[in-house]
Amino acid sequence: IAAYLFGGIICDYISIKKLIPAAMISTGALGLVMLTIPSPIIMVIIHGLFAITCLMLFFPAQTKAVRNLASVNEQGKAFGIFEGGRGISNAVYLAIAALIFGQMTIIKSESFGVRGIILFYSVMTILLGVIDIVLLKGIDDGKKGDSNDTVNLKMLTKPLKMPAVWLMIG
């Protein structure tokens, strides 16, 4: 929950051109660490770091990037195209992951298949993070960090008093 609360604030002060690639590359790197078959404590730490890289850094910056790509009158269309594209790419990734799992299970074992899936998703996430460094150069990141806005408790509690926020949460 804390990751969601602070993610939006962070992407208002740090460029999404830096946040998105950094979050993706670090998430992929954490996946590669999982391949070393770490201890249970390290696995818990890795999943905690996933919360930071994905929920606090990546998703708010991704939402801001999509929002900045469209005019005020085209927000619905932009998010619809984005979600549709994300659904299609997820289906393709899932098909590839299933193929990898099936082939690696035939070769060795189910655990070998799971390791293949982790490797696939980790490498793809790192590659896409590197590609994003180039692709995000032309996007307006809408960074507000240059202003004198300070984060205070009143700013954080204001959305909690809005019925629309609670409607979206529910």
Task: Please give the residue ranges for each predicted region.
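Central cavity-lining transmembrane alpha-helices of secondary-active solute carriers
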Residues: 1-9
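Primarily marks hydrophobic transmembrane alpha-helices of the MFS/SLC 12-helix fold
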Residues: 17-20
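C-terminal ends and interior cores of transmembrane alpha-helices
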Residues: 25-39
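Hydrophobic core of transmembrane alpha-helices in multi-pass small-molecule transporters
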Residues: 30, 41-57
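Intracellular juxtamembrane helix-capping segments at the cytosolic ends
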Residues: 56-71
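Glycine-rich segments within core transmembrane alpha-helices of 12-TM secondary carriers
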Residues: 76-102
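C-terminal membrane-cytosol helix-exit motif in multi-pass small-molecule transporters
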Residues: 122-144
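Juxtamembrane intracellular "pre-TM" segments in multi-pass secondary transporters
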Residues: 139-167
